[in-house]
Amino acid sequence: MKNRIQQLSFFFSLFVFSTMYSQYTDIINSNKPGFSESPYSVGTGVYQFESDFFYKNTSTKPTFSKPHTFGVDLFFRTSFFLEKLEINTQLTYQRETIDNDFNDGLSKFTLGAKYLLFEPVYKDATKEIRSWKKQNTFDKRRLIPSVGLYIGMHTDFLDTIHKKNSMSPKVGVLLQHNLTNNLNIVSNVFYDKIGTNSSEIYYVISTTQNFGYRWSGSIEYQEIFNKQQ
């Protein structure tokens, strides 16, 4: 028997609103806010830290308890060898409250890597100086997504209550459609906690529109299919 968890999220952000960075570049390549992940690396020689806070009030089982979870995600990204290859680490520290009982500690410590397998090349419409139509016609090649592959491993260096006494892999396919210079759609499919009783398959779709140098808005949908423990 499987559980289905659906989540719809809206984000309206002002530059560095819900994410903190330690980086100096002209353009920040971030996966935050939200849960989707771009197939693109941060680039060689970049050391980037991202973080956000979360609050969950959900229950995947028909019980009378009302679990609440509050925590922080820490994400470190860098690239040592290749422009297309990124090495990353994700840590999650959370506090769970069920009725009058609570526990807190490190609930996730994941080491991962992603590689950009394919990136389409688009027409440079600005060079079409003699034709307004060619300058403004939609480039059908933008329907072809950039493709990335993610491989990660959940370690067991966790707080006692979250320990599984084993490690488990995570794999995913990362897609990004750049429909315009300011509008993109990111789609992810992951197979997580492979080989465990809590293994799950989930997908995330997020659309982001840039309104200017500082403002952007996004909408995201996530659905999770997991085993019932």
Task: Label the model's feature ranges.
Residues Q23-Q229:
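Transmembrane beta-barrel domains of Gram-negative outer membranes and organellar outer membranes
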Residues M1-I28:
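Bacterial Sec-dependent N-terminal signal peptides
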